[in-house]
């Protein structure tokens, strides 16, 4: 569950490797329901819950019993507990991810997709945050997350105190 889209992926194990058999991506624009105080509105929570319930219905049709959802940037809000409780009513196991956890998952995805790539950096520019991960000899050496993604930046008016405050806040967390 991301700031911009909610994705359903169903995997089947084929010769000990996960193989995707279903991929649905629903634009939910959850970031649009989060105010400047980092509180998601009731409408945003309802939107996320409705999408997750529609996915649960699809999995019921497929007779998939185990289901879990990682929640990225949308869960880094003041009313996280309210969002998680609402999402759990759909029958899913809900796992809120910190920015660094998200970056480490990005690393694992990169490693899986490019098994011969052992040194480098990966970037994940999402709707509400950007994750950076550096790796050497196939191992992560540094991971960070900035609360600035393409949708959030699009909503910030350029050359305003609000924009400057958001960027400086992100920079303070990760001094160069």
What does each model-found stretch correspond to?
Residues 58-85:
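Short beta-strand-loop/turn "lid" adjacent to the catalytic site in phosphate-handling enzymes
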Residues 154-176:
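ATP/pyrophosphate-binding catalytic subdomain of soluble kinases
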Residues 53-67, 169-176:
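Phosphate/pyrophosphate-binding loops at sites that engage ATP/ADP/AMP, CoA/4′-phosphopantetheine
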Residues 5-43, 136-162:
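Short glycine-rich, Thr/Ser-proximal phosphate-binding strand/loop in the N-terminal lobe
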Residues 98-121:
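Conserved phosphate-binding catalytic cores of ATP/NTP-utilizing and phosphoryl-transfer enzymes
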Residues 1-5, 123-129:
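A short acidic Gly-Thr/Ser loop motif
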Residues 71-75, 126-128, 176:
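Glycine-rich beta-strand-to-loop/alpha-helix junction loops that act as flexible
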């Amino acid at each position: 569950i991301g700031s911009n889209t909610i994705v359903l992926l169903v995997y089947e194990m084929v010769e000990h490797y996960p193989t995707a058999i279903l991929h649905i991506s629903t634009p939910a624009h959850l970031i649009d329901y989060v105010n400047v105080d980092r509180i998601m509105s009731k409408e945003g929570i309802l939107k996320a819950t409705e999408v997750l319930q529609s996915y649960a219905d699809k999995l019921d049709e497929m007779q998939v019993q185990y289901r879990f959802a990682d929640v990225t940037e949308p869960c880094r809000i003041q009313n996280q507990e309210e969002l998680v409780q609402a999402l759990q009513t759909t029958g899913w196991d809900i796992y809120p991810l910190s920015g660094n956890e998200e970056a480490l998952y990005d690393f694992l995805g990169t490693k899986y997709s490019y098994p011969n790539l052992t040194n480098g950096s990966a970037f994940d520019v999402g709707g509400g945050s950007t994750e950076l991960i550096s790796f050497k000899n196939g191992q992560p050496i540094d991971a960070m997350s900035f609360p600035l993604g393409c949708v959030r930046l699009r909503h910030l008016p350029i050359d305003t105190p609000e924009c400057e405050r958001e960027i400086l806040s992100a920079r303070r967390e990760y001094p160069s």
